[in-house]
Amino acid sequence: MRFDITPVAKPRQTRRDRWLKPARPCVQKYRTWSNEMRQLCLDAKFFPGDQLYLEFHLPMPKSWSFKKRAKMDGKPHQSRPDLDNMVKSLDALVPEDSGIWHLEAKKYWSYEGYIIIENKDE
């Protein structure tokens, strides 16, 4: 299932993030993103299972030339944010992720940001 929302990596949480008002910008961005993602899943009636396939498509910077964008579209994204932090961001969908026992995750460059999440039931 494709979700048209730009992926966000989960920031490192500190104790201070629980009570600090307003929260740090990266924490505010993540909380907003997680609320939107949760709502998109509810609207689509999508419920993650215990085996997941994830694809994160990150938007290319506007500063890149058209030639470089055309070259990099669909290529693996090998810079920050790290893939493990992208996967951690899906805690918004799965409150108890200890039940997930199989996970495939990839990240790519694309013209616009979106996420593909599929249940892999064999």
Tell me what each language-model feature is.
Residues M1-E122:
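Acidic, proline/glycine-enriched N-terminal capping motif
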